[in-house]
Each structure stands twice: as C-alpha cells, then as structure tokens.
C-alpha cells in the first residue's frame, strides 16, 4: 500500500515542473498522478521545489491545521506552487482544470520519525 508520505509526494511534489511553458499542465498532471480516478479531485497544489526543502518545513513554524490538529508547519520562505482547480464545466471522467501559479508559503501536516509531510493543508 502507498504510505501517507509517498501519497503526499505523488499528489503534491513536482520539483522540476515548468507549468509556465505548458497551458495543459494541470490537466496532464492530475491524470498522470492518479487524481482523476473515480472522481475529479476538486483542488490540488503542486510544489516546484526540491523534496528536501519541502520536508524541511516539518521543522519550521508550528501552526494549527485547518482541522484543529496541531501537527502543521508553515514554511519560512515562499515556494513556487501551482494550484489546480476543477472547472465548473468539468464532467468526470473528462476532468478539466484551470491553473494558478504563485509564490507562497506552504502549510503541511507532518508525521513520523523522521517527521515528513503527509498532508497539504494550505498556502498563505
């Protein structure tokens, strides 16, 4: 089975991604990373930074998670991200997404020893 840490990497890490050169980035990546199976995942964020940089967030600023849990951490620096959001006209199985690129601080939930990201909580 896929671990929470591996699922996080599949759903959120694209260190070498260059969405700026590809208008179909979200449509292609959401399929490639298996987020359009059974339904179209409504929203997903990809992070274009080295995995080590994202894993390091687990030792940065401790903040409350959206669900009230206390194991979330906010990155000190802003990171290159791409938000993929399903379009209103999108109909499964033909999932269609619009993309927004940004530089934002990320908030992730971390678990384990060593502590690694297992859930993408928010961007600020």
Swiss-Prot record:
The active site is at 12 (proton acceptor), 119 (proton donor). Residues 1-21 are annotated as: Disordered. Gene3D superfamilies: Ribonuclease A-like domain. Disulfide bonds join 26-84, 40-95, 58-110, 65-72. It comes from the Eukaryota. SMART domains: RNAse_Pc (SM00092). PROSITE patterns: RNASE_PANCREATIC. This is Ribonuclease pancreatic. It comes from Galea musteloides (Common yellow-toothed cavy). The lineage of its organism: Eukaryota, Metazoa, Chordata, Craniata, Vertebrata.
